[in-house]
Design a protein with these regions (language model features):
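Exposed low-complexity, polar/acidic, P/S/T/G-rich flexible segments that act as propeptides
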Residues: 152, 157-160, 246-255
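Solvent-exposed serine/threonine-rich low-complexity stretches and specific carbohydrate-binding patches
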Residues: 101-106, 217-224
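Short, surface-exposed beta-strand/strand-loop-strand elements in extracellular ectodomains
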Residues: 200-215
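Non-cytosolic beta-sheet module surface loops
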Residues: 195-199
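Surface-exposed beta-loop interaction hotspot
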Residues: 117-175
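Non-catalytic, beta-strand-enriched accessory regions in extracellular/secretory proteins
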Residues: 171-187, 227
Length: 255
């Protein structure tokens, strides 16, 4: 069986000791804070929901910023993690929450990795939404800050992963329409067969990555396909399946 495996990155211990007061101020409207900061540390990460709740109860929550359709975000981790995996995991988590990346403002990878973007979402981007969607990709928010016009999120990234679809050998595995690319864990498979349920629309665009998200193959077609097979390298880990037209469903069958 091809198993859905989270990529556990066992690198340096997370060294950022987040400041609860800085986190509270980062989410506040700038007034004098009159909230308790007790019990906001949950298993080594910030209890974002409780902090937001306390700020709202005390009328300190920055509702104006977080109801705006755009927000400058900077994701920071002091752990030594592959930058491609860090960025891709964040981007896919945001996409899953219907948050668009309008612009990449910065990307640095030294003693710490930081990824700055202009994020867009109708109705606003609030801390609870960010916490929920990032947690699904294995991130923990350790704290917040305000840095050079950005809302900075300090992340524990040691358990980050791509949310890849689970597939079985020699069985059709329907993929639920995602609104974006389909991500399939193909580890252990020698080939991937993709069948489109929309025979008059799908034009294949498939990228193959290794476990560190280095692209090792690209398949791009200019004609409509209904059945498409790709031979996979031994180190293939992920297949990102895209298309140039709208499709209702794709099925894949690793062999």
């Amino acid at each position: 069986l091809v198993k859905k495996l989270a990529i556990f990155l066992l690198f340096s211990v997370f060294s950022y000791a987040f400041d609860l007061n800085s986190s509270a101020n980062a989410l506040s409207s700038g007034k004098d804070l009159q909230i308790s900061l007790e019990n906001l540390d949950t298993n080594g990460s910030l209890n974002v929901g409780e902090l937001v709740s306390r700020l709202k109860q005390s009328s300190n929550y920055d509702a104006l910023s977080f109801s705006s359709n755009s927000l400058n975000l900077k994701f920071i981790s002091t752990q030594k993690v592959p930058s491609a995996l860090f960025v891709k995991s964040i981007n896919l988590a945001l996409e899953d929450a219907n948050i668009s990346v309008a612009r990449v403002n910065s990307l640095k990878n030294g003693n710490e990795i930081s990824y700055g973007i202009l994020a867009l979402k109708s109705g606003g981007i609030d801390p609870n939404l960010l916490n929920f969607t990032l947690s699904k990709s294995g991130f923990k928010i350790m704290g917040f800050d305000r840095l050079d016009g950005n809302l900075a999120l300090y992340l524990d990234a040691k358990n980050m992963s791509l949310d890849a679809s689970k597939v079985n050998f020699n069985e059709e595995s329907p993929l639920v329409k995602s609104g974006g690319v389909y991500i399939v864990d193909v580890a252990g498979a020698s080939s991937l067969n993709i069948i489109s349920n929309e025979p008059n629309k799908w034009v294949p665009l498939v990228r193959i990555y290794d476990k560190n998200l280095n692209q090792i193959d690209l398949k791009r077609e200019n004609e409509i396909k209904t059945n498409y097979t790709i031979n996979l390298a031994n180190d293939a880990k992920y297949a990102l399946i895209s298309d140039n037209n709208d499709i209702t469903n794709i099925k894949n069958l690793p062999k």
